[in-house]
């Protein structure tokens, strides 16, 4: 945004990568140069399959099956034009207005287990209440022996007693790991409890 155009130093926490590393940027630049020299230019005038690049889909299914022991096929993989596009589809698929009967409909929201969350989620809904969230527990912690640090933790007491969850008004649970812009990382234990909560209510957990 305009803040980045300032002549004063700015730590950009509103989006993108707040910790760009020169050495990593150099690696990316080298890879992009090689791609351009090989076959990227050839693809400029061509459209790929509507499902996405077949080679990438095959690579993803092979990787996920090998790493997690799954039995995926190309039919289980959906490629989108970046994460914003993916969340547009997901949030409007599981959130918004749902018709229960001819005379009855219900609005469902996306549950964010704690806030602050990724600012990019804010503008992807088409209709209905966008989000429901609860305040996190903030725990003072030490880092390498130094005080003055803190960590966000999910307040499961508040989360599990949320009226919208009990009333079936939550379409999905969504969390970022790590979270942008705070860098907070939900623990394995927190993820396991969120998974169990999602299964209990029959809704997806989107990470």
Region roles according to the model:
Residues 1-55, 62, 66:
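N-terminal "arm"/small-domain region of PLP-dependent enzymes with the aminotransferase-like
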């Amino acid at each position: 945004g305009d803040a980045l155009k300032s002549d004063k130093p700015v730590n950009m926490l509103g989006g993108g990568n707040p910790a760009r590393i020169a050495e990593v940027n150099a690696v990316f630049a080298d890879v992009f140069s090689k791609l351009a020299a090989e076959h990227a230019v050839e693809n400029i005038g061509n459209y790929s399959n509507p499902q996405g690049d077949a080679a990438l889909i095959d690579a993803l299914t092979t990787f996920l099956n090998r790493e997690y022991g799954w039995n995926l096929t190309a039919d289980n993989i959906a490629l989108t034009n970046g994460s914003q596009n993916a969340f547009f589809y997901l949030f409007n698929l599981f959130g918004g207005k749902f018709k229960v009967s001819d005379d009855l409909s219900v609005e469902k929201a996306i549950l964010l287990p704690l806030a602050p969350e990724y600012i990019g989620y804010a503008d992807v809904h088409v209709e209905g209440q966008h989000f429901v969230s609860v305040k996190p527990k903030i725990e003072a912690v030490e880092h390498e022996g130094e005080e003055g640090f803190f960590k966000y933790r999910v307040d499961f007491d508040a989360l599990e007693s949320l009226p919208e969850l009990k009333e079936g008004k939550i379409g999905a649970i969504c969390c970022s790991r790590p979270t942008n812009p705070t860098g907070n990382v939900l623990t394995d234990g927190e993820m396991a409890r969120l998974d169990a909560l999602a299964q209990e209510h029959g809704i997806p957990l989107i990470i």
